[in-house]
């Protein structure tokens, strides 16, 4: 295995040698979506003739573990049928529990089998044009006390880019987990931690990010990798937002534009801030360009959301689309799902039940009963009303998010879930095929 330091040196040297033949953006709202034959093609946010909307899927649970996506990996630790005691809650503790070599063996088997070339062929055949691939900082570098398996994920990421290229798909690479965690979610790799902006952790995260930017912003990747997300879901309400901007986001932008002189597109998550919050940051007023704002939209992570009726859910979804129209940045809905419940096992984390059926309790937030989670993963036992509502909800979201740049649904496949699995939703005619097909048209008009 070539060392991270050596790979970084090679990537930087190569970037300096490559003539990227950049094309200046047409306007501050421009989006580089297609890069063909060394010529960038832009779509304009305010144009009625947008060349192509992003219609993508997330490859969640692959290079970053998530218990609810692949529960079998975590069930292997179960010793008690009555509770989840002893089951690792995230990838950090998964590796910590097994030790490096055994964790590497199990992870390598997972990486080798969960997504294969045929999945990319199928994704393309179903009309999608984009895959967003989450990866953790630990794929590229680790801290001395980290238990993570490192240096192996890049091989699979590169294979994914090759497969995407072969089948005409574009790729967003998404830094999904920061050192010390940027949100305390299990999908960051380390649950219940918020140390990302501490000096040691920030340095490690930036080291991984600059490597990703250096490698995947060169001409040999720009035909396929058309965006790099600086960080998934930094929890803005927990962090000092000015520090997040000035210590991480702006330095990353400056590194890409001024250090390695790349025109690669940057994707910036909204950090759970309201619409228009980011209008004055990297917005094009100072010759900045190529920054996309990523909004994530779910309606299942609070009792209030879960209690909404379908008309309310659809109204909220359509409002999300309208809300982006006044923003200065081009925007994409980088995550959303078909979920109408939080019933999927471990969706709320190992050790927690569902708010929907009243089995979830965390801190002072005691859930209450809304409905039953029985047969949630058996679509054959769903009522016709639930099937219809799921299709209506999906279609409304697709229409809402195509008001601007498009969407990337979370996620393409899971082991057991229906609500979070595009592949299964298509199989059961709950997700439109072709994507433009509508059983419930004009919901957002």
UniProtKB/Swiss-Prot annotation:
An annotated GO cellular component: extracellular region
First-listed, main subcellular location of the protein, grouped into a coarse class: secreted
Catalyzed reactions per annotation: Successive hydrolysis of beta-D-glucose units from the non-reducing ends of (1->3)-beta-D-glucans, releasing alpha-glucose
Cleavable signal peptide: 1-20
Any GO MF annotation of the entry: glucan exo-1,3-beta-glucosidase activity
InterPro entries registered for this protein in UniProt: Glyco_hydro_5 (IPR001547), Glyco_hydro_5_CS (IPR018087), Glycoside_hydrolase_SF (IPR017853), Glycosyl_hydrolase_5 (IPR050386)
Annotated compartments: Secreted
GO biological process terms on file: cell wall organization; glucan catabolic process; sporulation resulting in formation of a cellular spore
Keyword terms of this UniProt record: Cell wall biogenesis/degradation, Glycosidase, Hydrolase, Secreted, Signal, Sporulation
Enzyme class per UniProt: hydrolase
Enzyme Commission designation: 3.2.1.58
Residues the record marks as active site: 233 (proton donor), 335 (nucleophile)
Family, as annotated: Belongs to the glycosyl hydrolase 5 (cellulase A) family.
Its biological purpose: Probably involved in the processes of spore formation and contributes to ascospore thermoresistance by participating in the morphogenesis of ascospore walls. The enzyme may do this by modifying glucan linkages in the developing ascospore wall, thus strengthening it or lending it plasticity.
Name of the protein described by the UniProt record: Sporulation-specific glucan 1,3-beta-glucosidase
Annotated gene: SPR1
